[in-house]
Amino acid sequence: MQLWVGLGNPGPKYAMHRHNVGFMAADVIAEIHDFPPPVKKFQGWLQDGRIGSTRILLLKPGTFMNESGRSVRAALDFYKLAATDVTVFYDELDLAPMKVKVKRGGGAAGHNGIRSMIQHIGDDFRRIRIGIGHPGHKDRVTGHVLGNYHKSEMEPLADLLGAIAAEAEWLAKGDDVRFQSDLALRLQG
C-alpha cells in the first residue's frame, strides 16, 4: 500500500492556480485509474484504489498548502505507513513549465507544502516535481505561483497530466527511472 498526495489549496478560486497542479495530477490519476469518489478523511479528501496490483491511497489535503503535512501525518498514522511509502505531486518553480522530475528526499526549496510535510513526516518521501517555471524576478513569484494557468497552457497541461496518469503504474511499481523515461517518450510522440 502506498499513499500518494496531491498538494494544492482547497476551494474553487484556487482550482486553476499553478500552485494546485498537484491536486490536478491527483484528479487525473483518479479518473484514469477508475478510483471511487473521494471521501472526507484526514482533513482532506481520500480515494482508495488500485494502480496495477498496488493499492494506492490518493489524498488531497483539505488544509491550506502550509499545513499539508498534518493531513498526511494523520493518514500515515491511521494506515501505519512510513514516509518512504509516500509520493507527493506538486508544483516546482525552478523547473521549466510542463517538465517533470522525480526525486526522493531533500529540502523544501522554498515550497511551503513540502516544508510542512518535512516537519510532520520527515524528508524521506518521493517527490514528483511538476514544473511551472520561474517568472524571472523574485517580486513576481507569488503572482505567478498563485496565478491561473493561461488559456494557451491548458492543452499542454492536460497532455502532461494525462501522461503522468498513464505512466503512474511505474511509480506504483517503484520504477522511477522507467516512469521518467516513458513519460518523456509519451510527451514527445
Swiss-Prot record:
Q: Where is the active site?
A: 19
A cellular-component GO term for this protein: cytoplasm
Tell whether Hydrolase is among the UniProt keywords: yes
The record's catalysed reaction(s) read: an N-acyl-L-alpha-aminoacyl-tRNA + H2O = an N-acyl-L-amino acid + a tRNA + H(+)
| Enzyme Commission code | 3.1.1.29
On subunit structure and binding partners, the annotation says: Monomer.
The protein here is known as Peptidyl-tRNA hydrolase
* Gene name, Swiss-Prot/TrEMBL: pth
